[in-house]
Amino acid sequence: MRIVVGVLTAVVASGCGQAPPARPLAARVTEIAEVNTAGAYVDTIALSRDGSRVAIGQRNGSIRVWTPASGTEPATFGVSRQAVADLAFAPSGDLLASLGVYREGTLRLWRPGVSPNAWAELASLSVGHRCLGLRFDGLGERLAVMCAREVVIVDVSGPTAIARLTSSHREELTAFDLAANARRLITAGHEGDVTVWDPVSASALHTFSVARSRRPGLLPRGLPEPEVWAVLVALSPDGSKAAAVTIEGTVYAWDVTTGTEILIEAHAEAGGPPAGALRFTEDGRLLAPTNDRRGMRLFDLTRKTSHLAGTGAKNYAVVAITDDAAGFAAVTSAMESGKLVYDVEVWRMEPATGS
């Protein structure tokens, strides 16, 4: 394992004779090499709101947490034989939620001890069958868990399941998000619908469809229309705006109050985005993946423009964005000497200039 801490310049290639690309809006501040234990697959990543802690979850049940500024070895803990489907830091950064999958899904809450390398399990809760996603509210008091056919709302102080919202989607859930104020929930189903909910009354407020392929150009003769669904969804902190990215890489944004479409961007070369790579900033902009999966870009929904936030040399496999979208961390992978190795990049967004 190697940790590099410091502000690094993002390098973006441009063709001969072309104007230099716009300066990225984020700086890469930390790189951690070879984050996985021997032979383990990394499926999820979490980044604390202040960027001081980064965690990965492995398919063998192991969780690893770094505090890059300390320069110490990572804390390694977890439950064997429970693949880590998702991780999430509470807004305070001193509570980590993990979702383990083995037959039934198990939510676990962890806290650091006196030593940065000592994390202890506070509590656990069985949440149901085929559960894959976690999302804290803005206060860290509620935690939403996405399962195949429902979303479970958990009171973190228990932890206790205080509500179960049964999905109205025709097929299984593919993505979800909980607004920071916990007053809106968004879900996506494999059939191509995206629904915004009032989680208190368990009532659907708006349903949008992303099922139609938006990829530019004509399909080759004889090929059927592709199935399209949202693989990422997000709500603005106050729940007034919603966004989605489809399996084709098309980006959508809507006004939740009126139900109107704010933005749609389809690109012929875009592909399915990395997991976790969508979040609204506190001022209403949208942080989303680049079309080539090698970075992130920031959408101004008023001007309907986007600017490069950061880019690297490898495709992002999975991304974690802080609750305020002020930073993000990405997992990349490569084969080195016949073994699969995962690295982590941590980026911080620079203050908006108003341009």
Short names for language-model regions:
Residues 4-14:
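Bacterial N-terminal signal peptides
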Residues 16-355:
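WD40-repeat beta-propeller superdomains and closely related acidic/aromatic-rich repeat-like regions
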